[in-house]
């Protein structure tokens, strides 16, 4: 076993600066299935601040205490009532704060290698902690790791308490408070009165659920970066469109073609107004590209059924809509199925269209159907790659990950920990340069990763290829 790359300096408990007045918050049908998955582990890499690390640690402790006042559930614990319902008790029990050092590691060591280095996993607390343990462990931990020329701020938060949208709202607020912002505008909404709050009971074993994937399988993890121009080129190809000289889709030319296309005219009954640029999104195009490339790399027979699973935000899909700042999980996982033969024999548009139509169909009725299905059979979420042919997309390039300025710089990079990693787990991050650039954190078996790196259709869009 390799020696630890990170040395613990101190560990303490941080309490909210003000007492909470929130009542217990019942876990929803989106929260409860996450009791069997690891805590979310996400964090940001920064250059070294222009003041001593001891001053930074004091600042972050104070800022975290003040931030918890805006997010009381994170300082609480899970409690279960006699009927089996699980709640967050906003009891101000506190969160863990860890100060660690790895002063032999430089920023270039974190972001300069092809694969994500193993030592990045040590920048996060609560390694392999399962969300059910929130009954007797803090729901949040923050670790600040001092590097030779930088600092990594890593968070681990219980996945039955937050989804990605709620997590990044917390992290952004933590950064705002640290840099002296007095008025927090994006106040979380703790309302619990939607269809997601159910009377169904999730029955669990007395010692809690276990993760549903092998945590010790050999894996490779790599960040693939896609510039805005590459993504626009990919989107245009997916939609059978042309780009103009600025790299934008030539809308005028496309609309003229559609005006004279009998098929488009015949489809008028289905859609009166056609927005050509919105048919297949940039992100769906990128997902289709990855689906095809990984399917090729896995060398399946054409009859093998593959699955591409996407998480969708339900906040704006429900009627009435949830507040965009609703705090908790408001996501559902959509599986899209296609045989390996169909994925590879059809073009990019066909693959992206399968993703597009399933996401579009996930409206208020479908969200409620998913809720009713879960209520008939309450269960934990089966996270993993059970037949070797699955891809699971998480996170989102829309999350404001690079808005986290704690007072001296924006992040140099965003990284995640070991949590919930298995063959076929993909996470989407915004690129640091912004403007629609995207980073894909791809976790695959070593042999599949090798095949992906040799896939010319995929790699032609990757930055630096």
Question: For each of these PLM feature ranges, what is it?
Answer:
Residues 32, 228-239, 446-455:
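Short alpha-helical interface patches
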Residues 33, 139-145, 423-431:
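Short, surface-exposed beta-strand/loop micro-motifs that present aromatic residues
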